């Protein structure tokens, strides 16, 4: 009798466990471009919770709208830096700036008031993809697709 009770309890618990819903992935509902225009001072880069870096494109260098490095209304990218803070309202980006290029480059700045570096590239938002942990864009000047990814720290 006791053995039957234990077996029935085990079967019942196993059956109840198998009826629990699986974990849902809500990342498809995330829009990383929210706050990248106006004065939201956010960026669309490849970010995951507790990640060590926040790689993202930098479209601006100076002034208030350059706080996060990315401003949605811009159409040129100066490079991709690896440290950003989202929504802070102060310049906190631009460390370890990388730019994929092809051919001979001119590395002189365009002038103090210019928002573009000499090696900047035009891009289109139609060729831009941002998802949690992933960012890609096609750089028109160099005909290069740049892809950024991030993972959580171990």
Where are these regions (language model features)?
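Bacterial Sec-dependent N-terminal signal peptides
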Residues: 1-24
């Amino acid at each position: 009798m006791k053995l039957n009770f234990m077996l029935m309890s085990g079967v019942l618990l196993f059956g109840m466990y198998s009826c629990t819903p699986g974990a849902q992935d809500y990342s498809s509902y995330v829009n990383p471009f929210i706050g990248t225009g106006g004065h939201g001072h956010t960026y669309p880069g490849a970010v995951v919770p507790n990640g060590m870096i926040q790689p993202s494109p930098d479209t601006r260098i100076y002034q208030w709208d350059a706080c996060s490095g990315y401003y949605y209304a811009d159409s040129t990218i100066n490079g991709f830096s690896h440290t950003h803070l989202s929504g802070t309202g102060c310049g906190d980006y631009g460390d370890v700036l990388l730019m994929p290029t092809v051919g001979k480059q001119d590395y002189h700045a365009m002038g103090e008031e210019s928002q573009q570096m000499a090696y900047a590239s035009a891009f289109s938002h139609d060729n831009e993809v941002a998802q949690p942990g992933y960012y890609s864009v096609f750089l028109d000047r160099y005909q290069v697709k740049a892809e950024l990814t991030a993972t959580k720290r171990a």
